[in-house]
Amino acid sequence: MVIPVNLTIYVKLTGMIERLLTPIVLESLSWNPAVAILGPRQAGKTTLALEISKQLTSIYLDMENPEDKQRLESPSAYLNNHSDKLVILDEVQQYPDLFMSLRGIIDKGRREGRANGRFLILGSASNDLLHQSSESLAGRIQYMELSGLNPLEVLSADYDKQKLASLWLRGGFPSSFEASNDRQSLTWRTNFIRTYLERDIPTLGPRIPAETLMRFWTMLAHSQGEILNASKLAAALGVASITISRYLDLMVDLLLVRRFSHGLAT
């Protein structure tokens, strides 16, 4: 599949914020069979992918949608019928057995001259997805990360202090940043956190009380930029230090927290 890419412009829809990753993904699809975009829920992965689908002949499958998942009960048969399209697979960590099938489909396509631009994979849990895909798709996939909006994306050609102030106050999740007012933005963030803690995290396996994770997440926010003191956090939560490490690993895996090495050069 030949994918035309114009790197001098960003893909843009009226009323949407340009994402700097869009042209990079398009370029990567032109020379990789598969591209994976990792990022927390609501960071804009699906919006970015659907915007790309407007430029390329594509189909979109959400692995959290039972109907879409049913279509892939025989993945090779279904996907080979769409070998001329870019297949977008959203929340693919919900279907870990799919990766081995993707490997066979990609290798078959290479033999038949359809090497690149086959799959755009979206995932919200980095470690699981990386482990599942790296074993099956080594040499066939490129990984990228989409985080929240950054200043370059929210600022127009003219410097706008209000936009920048809103970014610092509301954060980089698009729905929070673009809310009609600060109150609605706060409501969105509150609901997002509650849903993540009470619904999304349990579906990934961990059985940790939502209230405990909320307290832990809040303490991490107050400790931003500081050296992690696991013992202090453990004492505050009434758990062992090793439990704090487990909680932190979970937050990092869900791309909700960034962890930097103490020895990282500045």
Task: Please annotate each region the language model reported.
Residues 58-86:
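Short glycine-rich substrate-engagement loop in P-loop NTPases that contacts/grips substrate
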